[in-house]
C-alpha cells in the first residue's frame, strides 16, 4: 500500500470518526496495520519530543511501545486505584475507534504506573515527587504480536480541522 493511499485512508477514517461524534469534542483513535515492525526500534522515532515513553515486552510475542500523553491523570490518596480504573473506563468509553475491527493486541490501552507507598520520606521531599498513580492514554501506540503490527494515534478533536491535523 502506498503512503498516499494510507494517508487518504486515515484521513477518511478521521473524518468518519468526527462525523460520528455529532460535532462534540471527542477522543479519536486512528489505527494502521504495519507488518514486521519492531516497537523497540521504532520507539525513538515515536518519542522524539515526548516526556512519556513506554516499552512493554511480554511473552508470548506481544510487544507494545507508547509515547506522549493524549489524556492523563495523576492521583494520590487511598482511593487512587479505584479512581484510576474509573479514569481508564471513562477514556475508553469516550474513544471513537476508527479501526474497531483491529485485533485485541492493537486496541487502545490506558497505561497505569503505580507507586504503592503514599508516604514520602523527609530526605526526598525536596526531590520531584512521582505521583502515586499515573494513568495515561498515549498519543502514539505501536503494538506487535508475532509479525502483525499496528500503529495507533489517539487525539482530542473538536472540529473537522482537528481531524486533519491529527
Residue locations for each model-derived region?
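Signature of the chorismate-utilizing enzyme
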Residues: 1-166
Amino acid at each position: 500500500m502506498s503512503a498516499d493511499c494510507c494517508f487518504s485512508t486515515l484521513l477518511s477514517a478521521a473524518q468518519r470518526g468526527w462525523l460520528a461524534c455529532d460535532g462534540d469534542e471527542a477522543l479519536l483513535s486512528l489505527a494502521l496495520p504495519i507488518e514486521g515492525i519492531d516497537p523497540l526500534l521504532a520507539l525513538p522515532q515515536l518519542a522524539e519530543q515526548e516526556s512519556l515513553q513506554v516499552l512493554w515486552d511480554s511473552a508470548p510475542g506481544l510487544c507494545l511501545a507508547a509515547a506522549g500523553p493524549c489524556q492523563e491523570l495523576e492521583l494520590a490518596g487511598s482511593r487512587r486505584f479505584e479512581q484510576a480504573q474509573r479514569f481508564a473506563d471513562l477514556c475508553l468509553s469516550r474513544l471513537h475507534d476508527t479501526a474497531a475491527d483491529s485485533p485485541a493486541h492493537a486496541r487502545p490501552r490506558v497505561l497505569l504506573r503505580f507507586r504503592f507507598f503514599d508516604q514520602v520520606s523527609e530526605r526526598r521531599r525536596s526531590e520531584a515527587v512521582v505521583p502515586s498513580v499515573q494513568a495515561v492514554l498515549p498519543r502514539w501506540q505501536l503494538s506487535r504480536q508475532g509479525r502483525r503490527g499496528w500503529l495507533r494515534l489517539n487525539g482530542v478533536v473538536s472540529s473537522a480541522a482537528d481531524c486533519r491535523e491529527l
